């Protein structure tokens, strides 16, 4: 009579292996839930990239055969479409309220891939969009009797000149550092070209000279550009000072590479926008409520 009771007791007792298995499954589910929530939070915190440059292919330059590029020839174009057409209602992109995404079409005039047509997808505020057309509009404005008015105000005057004098050593140091950095990259790229892509005679003649004269060349270039940037930033108005002070290197390395015929050695590329006068007409037709826009200039 006692044997069935013992059997029943053994059946009712939980197995230690089953308990450990349940704990493992519960822990796995908890970790999976935490990772899923963490992944969702991480997605919501991601910010949309400020800009992306898409290089146009040869088929995209000509409008005569728009249907040729199909299948695998459109990865970069699809990347740009996904970049612009991504749903902004989700919380994945943190788009500022006063910003919008526009497409600026231009040509690389200096640097790598010179002459290449590019589409620049960039986020710009309303103020930045207006500043794109400001140089054209300001050049059309003429002062009465052809005289330039020298006015005094909060944004222009002797106090601005005093400020530029104070910033003179700071601008010199910053320009020296930036010019040294870009100059070193340019020198290294030129050295690689003559060492790996040119003939044996270039390797034994140019490369030793580049190595020997590097300290003299880099110090002379950085010091000259630093002194030039410090003098040029002296101004009467805040706007002119900021335009001159923020351009530390003055595009010298890109200009030097273009003169030497070594555009690929430039540490950066300069893109010239096409038909910038169309920006103002494009902006006038936009709905201010719309957050994401595309304008071709």
Curated annotation (Swiss-Prot):
Residues 1-159, 232-297 are extracellular. It is a multi-pass membrane protein. Coiled coil: none annotated. It comes from the Eukaryota. InterPro entries: TMEM169. Signal peptide: none annotated. Its main location: membrane. The chain crosses the membrane at residues 160-180, 211-231. It is found in: Membrane. Residues 61-85 have a biased composition (Acidic residues). Residues 1-85 are annotated as: Disordered. Pfam families: TMEM169. Keywords: Membrane, Transmembrane, Transmembrane helix. One of its GO terms (cellular component) is membrane. This is Transmembrane protein 169.
């Amino acid at each position: 009579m006692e044997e069935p009771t013992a059997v029943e007791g053994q059946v009712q007792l939980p197995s230690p292996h089953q308990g450990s298995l349940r704990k493992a499954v519960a822990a796995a589910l908890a970790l999976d839930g935490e990772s899923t929530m963490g992944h969702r939070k991480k997605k919501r915190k991601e910010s949309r990239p400020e800009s992306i440059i898409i290089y146009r292919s040869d088929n995209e330059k000509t409008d005569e055969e728009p249907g040729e590029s199909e299948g695998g020839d459109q990865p970069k174009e699809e990347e740009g479409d996904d970049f612009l057409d991504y749903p902004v209602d989700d919380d994945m992109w943190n788009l500022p309220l006063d910003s919008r995404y526009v497409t600026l079409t231009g040509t690389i005039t200096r640097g790598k891939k010179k002459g290449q047509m590019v589409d620049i997808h960039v986020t710009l505020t309303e103020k930045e969009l207006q500043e794109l057309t400001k140089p054209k509009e300001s050049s059309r404005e003429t002062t009465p009797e052809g005289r330039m008015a020298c006015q005094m105000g909060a944004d222009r005057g002797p106090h601005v000149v005093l400020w530029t004098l104070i910033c003179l050593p700071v601008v010199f140091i910053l320009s020296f550092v930036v010019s040294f950095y870009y100059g070193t990259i340019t020198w290294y790229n030129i050295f690689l070209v003559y060492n790996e892509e040119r003939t044996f005679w270039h390797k034994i003649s140019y490369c030793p000279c580049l190595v020997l004269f590097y300290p003299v060349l880099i110090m002379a270039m950085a010091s000259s550009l630093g002194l030039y940037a410090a003098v040029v930033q002296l101004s009467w108005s805040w706007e002119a000072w900021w335009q001159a002070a923020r351009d530390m290197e003055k595009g010298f390395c890109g200009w030097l590479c273009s003169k030497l015929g070594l555009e690929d050695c430039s540490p950066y590329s300069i893109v010239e926008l096409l038909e910038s006068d169309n920006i103002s007409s494009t902006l006038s037709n936009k709905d201010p409520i719309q957050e994401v826009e595309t304008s071709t200039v």
